[in-house]
Regions:
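Terminal-region recognition feature
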Residues: 1-155, 159-164, 168-169
Length: 169
């Protein structure tokens, strides 16, 4: 596939047929205990977070969801997390640090939501706080880029000891 153009690779990264975060999470992890909300404002369904088991070991798993149908895309804001989503992820990361659980993230986002409401609710600060927190964690962090990884919105969930990019991501 060395003759694939950059534009074709972008199309491949955005393909609806690509496995999403939940496909990987449901295939790899057991005993999921889903965590919702940022404890400040509201739940962002775009960012999924759970405590789970990977080969019997407890881990924290975080992923961005885009959806496949129009209804799902609307529900998940087309894969663009809000400040609440980043704060939920931070809450889970702090909890993972406290209980010494490794963190695994699955990133597929065109970037953070850019709406006026998101900016008013502290989108830039939420992204910066995620970057700072992830870079200071003592637990192992594996970040897997499974599709798009646009701008700081993706970086906020992709700082890790190991960063894995899937082909055409």
């Amino acid at each position: 596939m060395s003759d694939v153009t950059a534009a074709q690779r972008v199309k491949l990264a955005r393909a609806v047929s690509r496995p999403g975060a939940m496909d990987y999470i449901n295939a790899l992890f057991t005993d999921l205990f889903v965590c919702k909300g940022d404890r400040l404002h509201r739940e962002d369904p775009c960012v999924f977070g759970a405590i789970a088991r990977f080969h019997g070991k407890p881990v924290t798993v975080i992923g961005t969801r885009k959806g496949r149908t129009f209804e799902e895309k609307m529900k998940y804001n087309f894969g663009m997390p809000s400040p609440e989503g980043y704060r939920k992820a931070q809450r889970l990361m702090r909890q993972a640090e406290k209980f010494k659980r490794p963190i695994i993230t699955f990133v597929d986002t065109p970037g953070a939501y850019q709406g006026l409401e998101a900016e008013a609710e502290g989108q830039g600060q939420a992204i910066a706080a995620s970057l700072a927190l992830m870079s200071s964690l003592s637990v192992p962090v594996i970040a897997v880029v499974i599709g798009e990884a646009g701008s700081g919105g993706a970086l906020a969930l992709a700082v890790g000891n190991r960063v894995i990019l899937l082909e055409n991501a």
